[in-house]
Amino acid sequence: MRFYRTYLLVAGAFCSLCTLAVIFNCGWDDSPPATPSAINGGGSNAPLISSPTNLPETFLYISILTSPNETERRQNVRDTWFRLSTKGPSVFIAKFAVGTMGLAAEDRRLLAEENEKFGDLALLDRHEESYERLAKKTLACFVHAFANFKFKFFLKTDIDSFVRITPLIINLKQIQDPMLYWGFLDGRAKPFRKGKWKEPEWNLCDRYLPYQLGGGYVLSYELIRFLAINAQLFRHYRNEDVSVGAWIGGLDVKYVHDPRFDTEWRSRGCNNEYLITHKHTEQEMQEMFENLKKTGKLCAKEFQKHPSYVYDFSKAPSECCTRVNGSNIP
C-alpha cells in the first residue's frame, strides 16, 4: 500500500510538471504574429490580405472593371450614372479596377495622374491585364476591396454597364442577406468548347454551376471575405462570372434572380425597371442619363430585343430558365 501511495505521488508530480511546461510554452508564445503572406500560403505571388480593421466604411462597394487605356469610358461613367446620386461614401464607394503589372512607365504615370485628379481608381499592381486573366482580375478586386474597405455588399460591374445606383441601393436594403448573391441567374448554360469563351479547364459537369451573369451582380461581405481569404485555392476559369458561381457553389448562398439586371452578354433592350443594363456605347450611356434627368425614366421608349425569364427554383438548374416571347418580364 505504501509503495502504491508513493507511486501515485510521483506520478501526480510528474503530470503537474508536464502541464506547467505545456502552459508555459503554449500560453506565452513570444514569436511574431503571422504575416498576411504567411496566412495566405506565402510566396511572392500571394495576395496580401490585411486584417479588415479601422478601414473606410460604406454600405455598397462598387468595382467597375476597366482596362488602362479606357480613359474616355471611365470619364463617361463619371459623367453619367456616377452623377445619379448625391449620397456620400458612407452609402457607396465606386472604384475603377485597373491592372498595372507589366504596364509601360508612361501608362503608369497617366493612371497615377488620373487617380490623383479623381481618386477613384483601384490600381491592382499584381495583375496583368488580358481577357484570359479576367477571372483572376475579378478575384483580385475581391481581395483589394476586402483588404482596404469595410462594406456590407459588393457590386461587380463592367465599364459598359449603366447602373441606376439609387433604386439599386433601395432594393438592396430591402433584400439584404448575409449570404446574398443577387443578379441575373443562369443554371442551364453549357460550357463553350471553342471560340472566345471556350472553357478548356471546365470538367466539373456538363453544365456550368448556377451563376449570375457578368454585366453586374451583388455579393455580400461574407462571400467576399470567403473569396478573398481563399483566393489562392481557386481554379481560374476563362469566364469570370462562371468562376464566381463555381467558387461559391458549395456554400449556403442566398441566390436572388432579378430580371431587372440586364446583364447578359448582350442587352435585352430598354426597360424602365432595369437596375443595371449592360453592353452600351458611350452615347447610349449619355442618352440614358439624360432621360433619367429629364423624365425620371431610363428609356425614351421601352423595347425588347431578346426575351427574358424568371428563374424556376422548383426545377433542376438545367430546366430553370424558359424565355417567354412577348412577356412583361423585364
UniProtKB/Swiss-Prot annotation:
One of its GO terms (biological process) is protein O-linked glycosylation. The keyword Transmembrane applies. It comes from the Eukaryota. Glycans are attached at residues 69, 325. Residues 25-330 are lumenal. Its EC number is 2.4.1.134. Pathway: Glycan metabolism; chondroitin sulfate biosynthesis; Glycan metabolism; heparan sulfate biosynthesis. The chain crosses the membrane at residues 6-24. It is an enzyme of class 2 (transferase). Signal peptide: none annotated. Residues 1-5 are cytoplasmic. Beta-1,3-galactosyltransferase that transfers galactose from UDP-galactose to substrates with a terminal beta-linked galactose residue. Required for vulval morphogenesis and zygotic cytokinesis, suggesting that glycosaminoglycans play a central role in vulval morphogenesis. This is Beta-1,3-galactosyltransferase sqv-2. The lineage of its organism: Eukaryota, Metazoa, Ecdysozoa, Nematoda, Chromadorea.
